[in-house]
């Protein structure tokens, strides 16, 4: 009887862990970030509950832009160890480091596909910034864009069918673009000074930054009623202020967008509904609060605050409550991913 009761308790505890997606050894419960505490930029992970941090890299090079793989077992990042910027990956324990790219020119902005089988990135090997795809099985990089204006990588669609990126340049080239890496389709979605496209987890919308007369605002592109993405996509303006609004991040349920606004004189973190309504300020101080990232279950956010001078890693509840400082050093900490 006692054994049966114990088994039931352990089973319930296991289910609770899965439901919360935090604690109980969940890989994605930890936050990865960059710290310059040792004099150069290194990749760390930190437990959001205990505040205990562990270095994943420890070398003489600068390691930046960490991003978790979808299964939470690996972190891809950018390293200048070879002299050029290259894409590396490290396991969640920091024991296995692999260089993924080794080609002339800088490689940057790694972005895992939703199934973790491919890594998109930007390469400068041909003289300008182009989007490449690196299958994890073959490790042979494939060029998927080929234009003179530099490309800036944005986001994968949740189903892995499309890659969103942006370009500068003339009206014929600038704006948001969609490319299906497995095919030949290329969609010129917008034709303005647009960048930083972020796909909603439900796949219905793309939030992005539009710069008009030097001012950044957030817009929403929504797919057509037939479920396709075309150049006559529906656009909705989400913010309209004299100061910049940028750095958008979708909640896991696609209902809420976190973003950074400078409407108060410095960068503060806000949230709003997907249609731009109910804009609510979550942080309030005279320092910049930047880079909001949602926890996997949407209950919390990690962000970077300059309240104490250099950037430090903080967390808070999804409504701005229970704000807590995770890193406490005199160096810069930034680029969190949860």
Question: What is the meaning of each model-derived region?
Answer:
Residues 2-11:
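Bacterial N-terminal signal peptides that target proteins for export
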């Amino acid at each position: 009887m006692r054994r049966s009761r114990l088994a039931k308790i352990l089973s319930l505890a296991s289910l609770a862990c899965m439901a919360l997606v935090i604690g109980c050894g969940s890989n994605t419960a930890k936050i990865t970030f960059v710290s310059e505490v040792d004099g150069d930029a290194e990749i760390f992970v930190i437990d959001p509950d205990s505040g205990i941090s562990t270095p994943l890299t420890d070398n003489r090079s600068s390691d930046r832009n960490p991003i978790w793989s979808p299964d939470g077992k690996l972190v891809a990042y950018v390293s200048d160890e070879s002299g050029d910027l290259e894409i590396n990956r490290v396991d969640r324990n920091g024991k296995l480091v692999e260089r993924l790219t080794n080609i002339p020119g800088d490689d940057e902005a790694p972005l895992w596909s939703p199934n973790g089988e491919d890594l998109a990135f930007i390469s400068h090997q041909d003289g300008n910034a182009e989007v490449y795809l690196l299958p994890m099985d073959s490790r042979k990089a494939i060029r998927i864009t080929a234009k003179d204006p530099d490309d800036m990588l944005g986001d994968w669609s949740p189903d892995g069918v499309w890659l969103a990126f942006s370009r500068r340049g003339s009206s014929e080239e600038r704006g948001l673009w969609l490319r299906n890496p497995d095919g030949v389709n290329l969609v010129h979605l917008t034709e303005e000074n647009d960048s930083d496209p972020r796909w909603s987890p439900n796949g219905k919308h793309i939030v992005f930054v539009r710069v008009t007369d030097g001012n950044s605002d957030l817009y929403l592109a929504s797919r057509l009623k037939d479920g396709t993405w075309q150049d006559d996509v529906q656009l909705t303006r989400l913010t309209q202020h004299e100061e910049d609004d940028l750095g958008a991040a979708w909640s896991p349920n696609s209902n809420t967008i976190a973003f950074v606004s400078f409407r108060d004189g410095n960068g503060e973190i806000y949230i709003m509904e997907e249609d731009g309504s109910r804009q609510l300020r979550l942080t309030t101080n005279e320092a910049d609060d930047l880079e909001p990232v949602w926890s996997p279950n949407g209950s919390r956010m990690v962000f970077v605050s300059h309240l104490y001078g250099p950037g430090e890693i903080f967390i808070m509840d999804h409504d701005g409550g229970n704000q807590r400082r995770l890193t406490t050093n005199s160096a810069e900490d930034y680029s969190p991913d949860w």
